[in-house]
Amino acid sequence: MTGNLLNRARHIAALFGVLLLPIHPALAETVEAKLPNGIIATADFRTGQPARPAVLLLHGFLQTRHSPPMSSLANTLADQGYTVLTPTLTLGINRRTKSLACEAVHTHTLEGDIAEISYWVNWLANKGYGSITLIGHSFGSTQIIYYLAQKPNPAVKKTILTSLVPLLSKPKEVQKALAQVKQARTSERAWERFTLSYCNGNYVAPHAAYLSYVTNDHNKTLDLLGKTKAPVEVILGGADTAMESIWPEKIRARGIPVTVIDKAGHFFDDAQEFDLSDKVESILKTLPAGKK
């Protein structure tokens, strides 16, 4: 059964409450890694066919590998024979399994997130995968852009960024935090409440940790998009209220191909989930084998 037909069959089965099992289920192995900072990170790994590229999927802001749409996309790709790695960023927590609340104390930084992405990409490459595709969702897409802007592993042949949108923050809060840090009037133990993404005035973090995310604004993100060291494609939802209407054109102006899926929201719910997986699979089929 082809990927498109299997996806459509699942959708029809879901409408009638039927559980449609994959023909060749790929069992996930949970792997652990002790990072240089001593934190234990985890990921689910499923081995696929050597002729297909390996895929690393990264979840959105404060979420885990079990969060949609990356969790369902990972299942679909594994069923289609792709090697799939889905890490959960630790955000400074050993073996993190739950989404992190806005009200939690956030000492993690963008730099730490990038280091973890690098670790897992290298982990895949060290297992012999010479063709790796990175797929991110929402802020996970932004984190991947910053990873690509550094020294990405040469095994990364393609990047697919879904629901790539600017990370919402308040300019006055940013300027105040910058002033506090510049005047050395803060410490790692001095926490404050900020607005960041969907955390509206209740994102608790030290100034420096907060600034690591917000000083990388959408203008810098767009600038880096045009300088990535691996080919990038962007997939957006036509009904995504988290982006302004001119956002797709701003991305295209950087020379990046953009696909807008009609009626899809930020999480590609309902039938648009299958439109997303169809588009992703069509891209993956053009790439070299994961292992030779």
Label each residue range with its predicted role:
Residues 27-48:
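N-terminal cap/lid segment of alpha/beta-hydrolase-fold proteins
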Residues 91-108:
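Cap/lid segment of the alpha/beta-hydrolase catalytic domain
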Residues 104-127:
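Alpha/beta-hydrolase active-site loop
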Residues 105-108, 154-283, 287:
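The alpha/beta-hydrolase serine catalytic core
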Residues 136-140, 144:
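Gly/Ala-rich beta-loop-alpha elbow adjacent to hydrolase catalytic centers
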Residues 50-51, 55-92:
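Short, surface-exposed "cap/lid" segments of acyl-processing enzymes
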